[in-house]
Amino acid sequence: KHGVLTIRCREKVHFFRGFMKALEYLETHGADSEFELRESACFQSSGAMLDCSRNGVLKVGKIKEYIRRMASLGMNLMMLYTEETYEVPEYPYFGAFRGRYTREELKSCDDYAELFGIEIVPCIQTLAHLHTALRWKTMQGLTDTPDILLAGDDEVYRLIDAMISSVSSAFRSRRVHLGMDEAHELGLG
């Protein structure tokens, strides 16, 4: 009637959810409709995990597209599973030739997500599930088996520290998901 839209929300991302719900309603019922929509989030965090590994490394533009979609759904958490498809400056072959992300690309995604109120949590592999990263000669002294790092080795701990430091420097989140997929053979090599 008056051409006024009021959206009240607690989180930035919920504004985008409210805006999209209003657009959806107006498309269905017409621009002259008067309406009130109410919605409450049932969870403190909701989101999705994108698998950007195993030759499925999404382009930065595609990640940003997912961020927009997630905002329209009111999701405030993106878990970015990169296995080893990110740069670790101290280990130049880590993630090499796999479409790995640069620190700047990851930072760009995080900056974009922040615009919508979405936290990106990096998900990396530690100790195991690192066959592709460990195939290089420069990594051979770090392996227990072809897929698993050598627990107890100081250089392995330096690698893990470098991995965590690398992804932590690209994201605002103070959380890093440390995956240990398929580590059942740890220490058996």
Regions found by a protein language model. Give the residues of each.
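Feature activates predominantly on carbohydrate-active enzymes
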Residues: 2-189
